[in-house]
Amino acid sequence: MANTDKFEMIAGMYDTPERIYIAKISSDAIRKHVADAKGKHAIDFGCGTGLVGMNLLDAFGSVLFLDTSPNMIHQVRAKIAELGIRNADTLCFDFEQESPADLRADHIFMAQVLLHIPDVEPVLSRLYDVLNEGGHLLIVDFDKNEQVVSDLVHNGFDQGELADMMGRIGYRDIRSKTFYKGSKIFMGQDASMFILDARK
């Protein structure tokens, strides 16, 4: 994934109070879409240190924490071991480079991940292939924000344009809404976050 080198460097100090707070808001939004997932397998895609997925372990039968950064995965493994978690596993893998042959999931969720992926359509297409029939992809990210100028990330996403792209891939029943607005939460700018729920 783009910016992997940056995440490798900051993995050990990633869990700041601000990130923990945003992760809680994100996981609460995701939880509202997975009420019937107790026996299901989920992937926390681009999991970082697992801040979002750790909040959702009780919502699923099992969770695979997946990231391109070995140091981030190391942080997740340490948390799993320390807390004695039994329904979680980890995988270090880059979806931008290749497609996993045997990976399957009922739910995939990704929070503040898409903005770090330069070319999002191929990755969303590969995630579609990973989903079981009827499975859900849940995306939490920032609404498009013209105040954000960066060479490292997208400046958010237009929900309609993202939904159109996903419809072309094959996703259906696509629903999205803005659910949170915060001060200086996106590259130092005031911003809003949306959640998108799409089904295979």
Task: Describe the role of every protein-language-model region.
Residues 112-113:
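Short catalytic micro-motifs in class I SAM-dependent methyltransferases
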Residues 171-182:
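Conserved S-adenosyl-L-methionine
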Residues 1-37, 75, 138-163:
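Conserved class I S-adenosyl-L-methionine
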Residues 121-133:
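A short glycine-rich, Lys/Arg-flanked "PGG" loop and its adjoining helix->strand segment in the class I
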Residues 43-97:
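Class I SAM-dependent methyltransferase SAM/SAH-binding core
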Residues 182-200:
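Core SAM-dependent methyltransferase catalytic element
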Residues 109:
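A conserved beta-strand element that flanks and buttresses the S-adenosyl-L-methionine
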